[in-house]
């Protein structure tokens, strides 16, 4: 299942699947996108920490920035959970009582998520910016964000393409950049072609 996700299929809980893989838990899955016996999942050796295993582009990702009193930001994150809007890559900051958060919401199952977030903030003391023209590209690999060479390569490829990314963040399983939607495929191809072991 994780391999399917690394190759672009939408996986709703990649962290849980990665946990199962690392702890020897057997998962069984069947594909619903084609006729036949379903997807055969085979055992592969762990690719190693710090090695890129895939590059993905996500057109269902929607970057958002919110600003306001800390209490509003806290309430906002609680509301996201109760509204069923999935989010990731949240970065919070606070200064002199004012707070802000940058995050990415998943619009696959909540296509109106951006509008719902903007509506929620319209009645508060804060502000909300929904970046509808941005999507995300991710270099996938356990511990990949700890590799300075990967950050450098990702930045160099963006520069060579003339693409400006307003945000690049690392997580336990990838390095994600916000990319203008019309350049997403170019970035995914360039990263894939230049990463050792993928190109």
Regions found by a protein language model. Give the residues of each.
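C-terminal catalytic "cap/lid" subdomain
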Residues: 1-170, 174-199
């Amino acid at each position: 299942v994780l391999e399917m996700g690394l190759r672009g299929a939408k996986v709703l809980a990649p962290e849980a699947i990665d946990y199962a893989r690392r702890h020897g838990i057997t998962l069984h899955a069947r594909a619903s996108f084609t006729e036949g016996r379903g997807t055969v999942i085979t055992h592969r050796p762990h690719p190693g920490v710090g090695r890129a295993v895939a590059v993905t582009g996500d057109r269902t990702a929607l970057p958002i920035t919110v600003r306001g009193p800390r209490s509003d930001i806290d309430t906002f994150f609680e509301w996201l959970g109760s509204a069923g809007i999935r989010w990731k890559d949240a970065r919070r900051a606070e200064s002199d009582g004012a707070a802000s958060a940058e995050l990415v919401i998943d619009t696959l199952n909540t296509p109106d998520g951006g509008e719902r977030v903007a509506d929620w903030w319209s009645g508060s003391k804060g502000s909300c910016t929904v970046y509808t023209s941005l999507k995300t590209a991710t270099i996938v690999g356990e511990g990949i964000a700890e590799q300075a060479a990967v950050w450098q390569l990702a930045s160099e490829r963006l520069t060579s393409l003339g693409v400006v990314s307003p945000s690049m963040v690392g997580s336990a399983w990838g390095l994600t950049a916000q990319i203008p939607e019309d350049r997403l495929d170019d970035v995914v191809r360039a990263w894939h072609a230049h990463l050792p072991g993928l190109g």
